[in-house]
């Protein structure tokens, strides 16, 4: 498959690690680089992890601690053997003169490595994200070169990552600037109530869209129609009594788990007080 047909999907944890590495950089470092880890399947490069590689850039050369990069990769392989080197990342919104030199190293580590740039300067009020592949140029028997060509990049996340991002969004504006922003964990029933309320609002939005299409107030979108059809087909067919019975059973199980967890918490607190109780 041609490198130009690749699509890059980046998980949020990668961006957090890039920003953390940029904040911890040396004072004389203007740019931070690192290795991208993930998998490649059917033309999709899914980036799930990364780490920073210490380096120094001079006018005519680049010095990178390659032994450190190999050690970090071996450690990551012990934790998750499914993650392989898929490319490299750098802070900034441009491809520099040293990028081709760094890319040559990663071209020896994997096929068609991707180059991801993250604009940590937040130009335009947001973090710019771009991905590139390096295409060889030249004529037979003549000079050759390379050119970084942009390819599509998008953000993706697993369900736990999505939940974590939503929790992080709740910390915005919950406390003054001089105090740490914290959000206490929600109880299980409160989470169910919040999810049900959000689901109800989304259903109302879908119903409004369908009514507007039927009334010819909105131009129908075939892609949205196919997604709604797939959504309807994914709903299991059951009677109202069956749904009520299944829902009540799940609620009973949830209440039982909450009760047992509270009992365990109380027992641990009691055991802690008995442990530190002074003996006669």
Swiss-Prot record:
It is found in: Cytoplasm. Component of the eukaryotic translation initiation factor 3 (eIF-3) complex. The eIF-3 complex interacts with pix. Component of the eukaryotic translation initiation factor 3 (eIF-3) complex, which is involved in protein synthesis of a specialized repertoire of mRNAs and, together with other initiation factors, stimulates binding of mRNA and methionyl-tRNAi to the 40S ribosome. The eIF-3 complex specifically targets and initiates translation of a subset of mRNAs involved in cell proliferation. This is Eukaryotic translation initiation factor 3 subunit F-1. Gene3D superfamilies: Cytidine Deaminase, domain 2. Residues 8-138 form the MPN domain. GO terms for biological process: antibacterial innate immune response; defense response to Gram-negative bacterium; formation of cytoplasmic translation initiation complex; positive regulation of Notch signaling pathway; positive regulation of peptidoglycan recognition protein signaling pathway. It comes from Drosophila persimilis.
